[in-house]
Amino acid sequence: MLSLLLPLISLLFQIQCFTVKSQPVPLNQICSNVTGNFTVNTPYAVNLDRLISSLSSLRRNVNGFYNISVGDSDEKVNSISQCRGDVKLEVCINCIAMAGKRLVTLCPVQKEAIIWYDKCTFRYSNRTIFNRLEISPHTSITGTRNFTGDRDSWEKSLRGLLEGLKNRASVIGRSKKNFVVGETSGPSFQTLFGLVQCTPDISEEDCSYCLSQGIAKIPSCCDMKMGSYVMSPSCMLAYAPWRFYDPVDTDDPSSVPATPSRPPKNETRSVTQGDKNRGVPKALIFASASVAIVVLFIVLLVVFLKLRRKENIRNSENKHENENISTDSMKFDFSVLQDATSHFSLENKLGEGGFGAVYKGVLSDGQKIAVKRLSKNAQQGETEFKNEFLLVAKLQHRNLVKLLGYSIEGTERLLVYEFLPHTSLDKFIFDPIQGNELEWEIRYKIIGGVARGLLYLHQDSRLRIIHRDLKASNILLDEEMTPKIADFGMARLFDIDHTTQRYTNRIVGTFGYMAPEYVMHGQFSFKTDVYSFGVLVLEIISGKKNSGFSSEDSMGDLISFAWRNWKEGVALNLVDKILMTMSSYSSNMIMRCINIGLLCVQEKVAERPSMASVVLMLDGHTIALSEPSKPAFFSHSNAVSDSSSSLGHNAKTSNYNSNTELYPR
């Protein structure tokens, strides 16, 4: 494969040498000193460098909007980037990456800066900028030609066009990019074309206000100019008497844009921001060719690397036959763990599952740990031990349980985890006494934390992973009630597109949380975890288990109960009675989470949202949610035991409670 690619790669590099000179030039940039400056090698500089380096590997996002933060506290770098709604995804990511690199060279010491390109905008700051309307700083790009006809006719046509686009953009919804284009008949037999766009993190009202402010600036910045851009951090608008955007159906984000028309040859543009004037790149054709060649090279390289990566992952999965785990720095002596747990005494036993028991331990330095000791006669447990260790050792996220190390001695297999004092989520939400500690704010925090942990597994980690056993007993809570996903013994690597399903004849997990297509047909994908997450959300809200659920009207399971009440307009019947007595109770937010939960358990796999969409819906309270379709009704009162079953054979079952564990299996 590599031998076939090398000649083509060489040719592409040679062609690139002749086209690289035509790189796009930013329309304008502003370096702000309001929030202070930084120096080289400081924490802020390091975080900014990490942020800029990550831009070239952004995941494809259909709305072209990214909110990324790196670092902590005062040295945290927050960024927002957005592409114009008619820009293809490949071009979008390239534009953002280029904008980031360019901005740090133009603003080398400022902690806050923004840059505008024709196809994207990028900004960063050490303050919070997400979910905030910002109309300053602003800039405008204008043509040099004036309209020479009747002023009143021009202004009437232009205002009518932009006001109409503004009204549509402010209600079109975040999933549609808040991007609208349109045209109208202008004076002197001309057609006026317009474009408006808001960032999707602001509300409908803020979008409308931002665009209104932009329209109000036109008389002072762009009076009678035949073609202008007016841009701020939260929105932008543009107009011209020619089609300057790629025509797309804004009701269909996936539609393919056509080739844009070119403006008149004698049209030039200038930038106005204070006393600044900056020209717009003229070599558009050469720049486009350069970008196309670079994109082609990247595509070929990605294909090659993905083939190599799949081979490496297959090799790593086959390494279970090798007893020697190379990460010696994480290895504990068996005697150390034996002493820490008082020889695995009953007093220190925290719980037990199908593959062994979990014990609390204290190391000689006072550090508390949780030790998972696999059963000596469980061959399947040995396989799970290696699988879990090799996977979890590579994962680092605040919403995943932290693996501290392992121990192998003779037939002994042990995993060492951080100790979490509040044990597992099921001990709280299913207990009427402990449930009093879970106010709505805490439950919402847990829902959001689990969602972000799953997003990391599905999309942001080095290895894309399906958990396959997400449930309340596998969500551990630290002293601040921060949720941490545990139990990766059932997890699987998944290095292909998330819309594609895999098949297995080994069904593992817990009934009530398992997606029907997985239980009945052995199909699993990232949407399998999404289904489990939806069940968990409904359990957190109701304080009831999906499996074995019962209510006054005796409906079979929690999902059925939630769906029926949703359709009847009384979804709040689902809510835990304890919550309704608490000061933090918020019916609007609870209704929103019920909606999200039902979206996640929809019967059709393709209609379930990705975890990236779920996190966006949870973080963006103004995002309009779609109406859920019929859920996958699936009612079982038993759980699959930790001994897995095969399709076509009777599954060994055990009581639901006996399958819950305090720490990962």
Swiss-Prot record:
Modified residues (Phosphoserine): 473
Modification type Phosphothreonine: residues: 510
CDD domains linked to this entry: Gnk2-like (cd23509), STKc_IRAK (cd14066)
Gene3D superfamilies (UniProt xref): Gnk2 domain, C-X8-C-X2-C motif (3.30.430.20), Phosphorylase Kinase, domain 1 (3.30.200.20), Transferase(Phosphotransferase) domain 1 (1.10.510.10)
Membrane-topology descriptor: Single-pass membrane protein
SMART domains hit by this protein: S_TKc
Any one Pfam family match given in the protein's UniProt record, by short name: Stress-antifung
Transmembrane segments: 284-304
Domain Protein kinase: 344-624
Signal peptide (residue range): 1-22
Residues modified by glycosylation: 33, 37, 67, 126, 146, 266
Stretches in topological domain Cytoplasmic: 305-665
Active site: 469
Protein keywords: ATP-binding, Glycoprotein, Kinase, Membrane, Nucleotide-binding, Phosphoprotein, Receptor, Repeat, Serine/threonine-protein kinase, Signal, Transferase, Transmembrane, Transmembrane helix
Every Gnk2-homologous domain range: 26-129, 135-244
UniProt modified residues of type Phosphotyrosine: 417, 518
Chain residue ranges for the region called Disordered: 251-275, 641-665
PROSITE patterns from the UniProt entry: GNK2, PROTEIN_KINASE_ATP, PROTEIN_KINASE_DOM, PROTEIN_KINASE_ST
Extracellular side: 23-283
The family this protein is said to belong to: Belongs to the protein kinase superfamily. Ser/Thr protein kinase family. CRK subfamily.
UniProt protein name: Cysteine-rich receptor-like protein kinase 26
